Regions:
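Gram-negative outer-membrane beta-barrel transporters
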Residues: 6-10, 19, 28-117
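Conserved small-residue
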Residues: 17-30, 103-150
Length: 233
């Protein structure tokens, strides 16, 4: 059993001039990194603890677990620490394997990840038709950057291996299935100004200037089977 702690400090990290957000938190949903003016004025920190333990070691059965609690934060233009886009807080892995006769091995891993932070949109600005037409998308509310969180996610992966030994090399045949029970993880929602038929949704109170926003729930995750061959010389 082991328990370790870590702490890392960042100084002079690039900070976007236009929206006041650290480039460390800019994923594909916020724009392309490198195409905007920045200042080397940001700070960041990453810290946490990691726990490892062998739960069971009996004959050919091995079960281990690792758990990490961590925080990843970077300052905004006001110097306030905000969660980075990778600040999921919790990471748990439960790993088990069993060696059968004749070089067969079966293993499984269950993984749990805390919900990632995401940023709401500025509804007042996004429902303004003139503003929407400039970017043709909803406006991120950077004043509430990463203030919301997605639900936690988890999945089970399983694998079976067969090793065949030759004089000068080893053949490893394997079959792997990721996300066995087909868990669908929640992604940040998608915002559109169109209905299901593709028509712009005018606001009846002010159809010339305002529009309605439709929120679409987004999910990812699928069962992914793989078979392969590994040759070791």
């Amino acid at each position: 059993m082991t328990l370790e702690g870590f702490y890392k400090q960042y100084e002079n990290y690039p900070l976007s001039v236009s929206d006041g957000i650290s480039l460390a938190s800019k994923g594909t949903e916020y724009g392309q990194v490198g195409d905007e003016e920045v200042l080397s004025a940001g700070k960041g920190r990453a810290y946490g603890v990691e726990f490892f333990s062998k739960i069971l070691e009996w004959n050919n059965l091995n079960v281990t677990t690792t758990y990490t609690f961590f925080r990843s934060e970077f300052t905004d233009k006001e110097g306030v620490y905000r969660p980075s886009s990778w600040d999921t807080k919790h990471l748990l892995n439960l790993i088990g394997s069993y060696k059968f006769p004749k070089n067969w091995n079966v293993s499984a891993r269950w993984r749990f990840v805390g919900g990632a932070p995401y940023t709401p949109v500025d509804m007042d600005l996004s429902t303004n038709k003139a503003a929407w037409n400039i970017t043709n998308r909803a406006y991120i509310d950077y004043s509430n950057f990463n203030s919301l969180r997605l639900p936690n996610a988890h999945q089970l992966d399983m694998r079976i291996d067969k090793e065949i030994y030759y004089k000068k090399w080893t053949l490893n045949l394997y079959a792997d299935v990721q996300n066995v029970y087909n868990f669908k993880s929640r992604n940040a929602p998608i915002y559109t100004n169109k209905d299901v038929d593709g028509a712009v949704m005018d606001d009846p109170a002010d159809p010339e200037n305002r529009q309605r926003i439709r929120i679409i729930d987004a999910y990812s995750g699928t069962v992914l089977p793989t078979v392969g061959i590994i040759i070791k010389m």
